[in-house]
C-alpha cells in the first residue's frame, strides 16, 4: 500500500480496481500517485525500450504513419524533435503517400531513426513479387534498407507457411535491404498466427493489437464481464512466449477504438484517457513499445505525456472504467471473431467493423476505404439481407445487423 501515494485512504471499491490490473502485472505495487501533484514535464520520449533480440532501442511511444501524407511532414519533424525514433508505415498506407512523406521528412536523419514497412504476402505470393514490393517501399522512403519488414495483417497461418517469404527474407537480409522481419495482425486468428510465427524462429518482431480492454481481470473486477481476450486466453501467453524467445513486441490498437472526444469531460488534473490507456499497455512486462497514429502536434504532445510510464497511476483507473462503460457495447473487438460463423454469406464481419472504426472513430476515411477495398467478403450481401442472421451474434452487445449495410454504403459511395 505504501506505493500508492495518495492523501486519503483507499476504499474497498478502489482496492478492487487496483487488483483488476494484476493480470497486466500492474497491481498495487505499481500504482503511483496523482499526475496532478506537480507541473507536467515537457512532453518528450522518456524511455527507449530494447526491441527483443534485435539490439534496437526504440521510443516506447512511437509514430504510426498510417494516415500520414506529404502535407503533414511537419508532424514527423515534431515527433523526431521530441525524441521519437521508430516510424511505422506500410506500402498501402495513404496509397503509398505515407512512405513518400516519411522519406521526405527524414531525409538526412536516416542514421538516427528506425524505419519499418509492411507488405501483404499471400500464400501464393512469389519471392520476386515481395522483393518488388520492398524495393518500391525503399524508393518511396528514400533509403537503402528498412529495419523491420512485416508480413502485414496476417490472419491465416497459410500466409506464414509460404516458403517464398522466407526465401525472400534471406535474400533481402544478405543484400542489406532489411535487417529484421516481423509479422503484424489484429484479427480473429491472431493467436494461432503469432504462435506459428514465433515457433518458426524466423520472425524477430511481432506487431499486434493489445489494449487495456483485452485484460480479463479488468472486465471481471470492474465490469463483471470479460473482453475478447477471455475468449482467447492465449494472448497473454503468446506475449510471454515472444519475450522468452527474444521476439520484440510492439502493440497497436491501444486505445480500444480511440473515441477520445467521449472522454474529454471526464479528464481531470492533466491526465487524459489516452495517457491512461498507454500507461496500462506499457506497464505490461511483455510489451516493448506501442505505435499510435499521430495526426497533429497536439496529439503527439498528449501521447508523449505517458512516455516513460511503466506504472499505472491512481487516476487512470476511473478513466479506463468510464471509457469501457461508455463504449463496451458499441466497440467491436476485432480479434474476438465470435460472430465469424453467423453470416451464411460469409461476410467478414470483424473486418467490416474494423474498417468502420477507421472511418467513424478515427475519422480516417481514406484509410477506411482502402482497407475495406481489400476485404474479400465485404458487406455487399447485407444490402439485400432481410433475415438478419447476425442479430444477437455479438456476445458484447454490438448491433451487427444495424451496422454492416450502412458501413458498406459509407465506404463504397462515390
Q: Model-derived features: where do they sit?
A:
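Conserved, mostly hydrophobic/aromatic
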Residues: 51, 63, 87, 102, ...
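Distinct, well-ordered alpha-helical segments
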Residues: 76, 99-107, 127-138, 158-167, ...
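Active-site groove signature of glycoside hydrolases
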Residues: 141-157
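Beta/alpha (TIM)-barrel catalytic core signal, keyed to glycine-rich beta->alpha loops juxtaposed to Asp/Glu
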Residues: 154-347, 351-354, 361-374, 402
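Short Fe-S-cluster ligation motifs
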Residues: 361-389, 413
Amino acid at each position: 500500500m505504501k506505493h500508492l501515494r495518495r492523501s486519503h485512504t483507499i476504499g474497498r471499491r478502489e482496492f478492487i480496481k487496483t487488483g483488476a490490473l494484476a493480470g497486466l502485472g500492474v497491481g498495487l505495487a505499481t500504482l503511483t500517485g496523482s499526475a496532478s501533484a506537480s507541473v507536467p514535464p515537457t512532453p518528450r520520449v522518456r524511455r527507449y525500450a530494447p526491441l527483443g533480440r534485435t539490439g534496437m532501442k526504440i521510443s516506447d511511444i512511437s509514430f504510426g504513419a498510417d494516415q500520414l501524407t506529404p502535407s503533414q511532414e511537419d508532424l514527423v519533424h515534431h515527433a523526431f524533435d521530441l525524441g521519437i525514433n521508430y516510424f511505422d508505415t506500410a506500402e498501402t498506407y495513404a496509397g503509398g503517400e505515407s512512405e513518400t512523406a516519411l522519406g521526405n521528412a527524414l531525409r538526412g536523419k536516416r542514421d538516427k531513426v528506425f524505419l519499418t514497412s509492411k507488405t501483404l504476402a499471400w500464400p501464393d505470393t512469389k519471392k520476386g513479387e515481395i522483393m518488388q514490393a520492398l524495393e518500391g517501399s525503399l524508393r518511396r522512403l528514400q533509403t537503402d534498407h528498412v529495419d523491420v519488414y512485416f508480413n502485414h495483417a496476417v490472419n491465416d497461418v497459410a500466409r506464414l507457411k509460404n516458403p517464398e517469404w522466407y526465401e525472400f527474407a534471406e535474400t533481402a537480409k544478405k543484400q542489406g535491404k532489411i535487417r529484421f522481419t516481423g509479422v503484424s495482425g489484429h484479427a480473429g486468428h491472431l493467436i494461432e498466427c503469432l504462435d506459428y510465427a514465433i515457433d518458426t524462429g524466423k520472425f524477430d518482431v511481432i506487431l499486434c493489437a493489445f489494449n487495456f480492454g483485452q485484460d480479463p481481470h479488468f472486465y471481471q473486477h470492474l465490469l463483471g464481464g470479460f473482453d475478447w481476450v477471455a475468449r482467447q486466453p492465449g494472448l497473454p501467453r503468446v506475449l510471454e512466449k515472444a519475450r522468452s524467445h527474444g521476439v520484440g513486441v510492439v502493440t497497436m490498437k491501444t486505445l480500444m477504438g480511440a473515441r477520445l472526444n467521449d472522454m474529454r469531460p471526464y479528464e481531470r488534473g492533466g491526465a487524459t484517457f489516452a495517457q491512461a490507456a498507454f500507461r496500462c499497455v506499457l506497464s505490461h512486462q511483455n510489451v516493448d513499445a506501442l505505435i499510435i497514429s499521430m495526426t497533429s502536434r497536439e496529439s503527439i504532445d498528449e501521447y508523449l505525456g505517458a512516455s516513460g510510464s511503466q506504472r499505472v497511476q491512481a487516476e487512470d483507473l476511473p478513466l479506463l472504467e468510464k471509457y469501457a462503460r461508455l463504449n463496451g457495447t458499441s466497440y467491436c473487438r476485432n480479434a474476438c471473431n465470435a460472430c465469424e460463423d453467423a453470416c451464411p454469406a460469409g461476410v467478414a464481419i470483424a473486418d467490416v467493423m474494423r474498417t468502420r472504426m477507421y472511418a467513424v472513430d478515427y475519422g480516417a476515411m481514406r484509410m477506411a476505404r482502402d482497407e475495406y477495398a481489400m476485404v474479400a467478403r465485404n458487406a455487399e450481401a447485407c444490402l439485400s439481407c432481410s433475415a438478419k442472421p447476425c442479430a444477437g451474434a455479438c456476445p458484447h452487445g454490438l448491433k451487427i445487423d444495424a451496422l454492416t449495410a450502412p458501413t458498406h454504403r459509407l465506404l463504397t459511395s462515390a
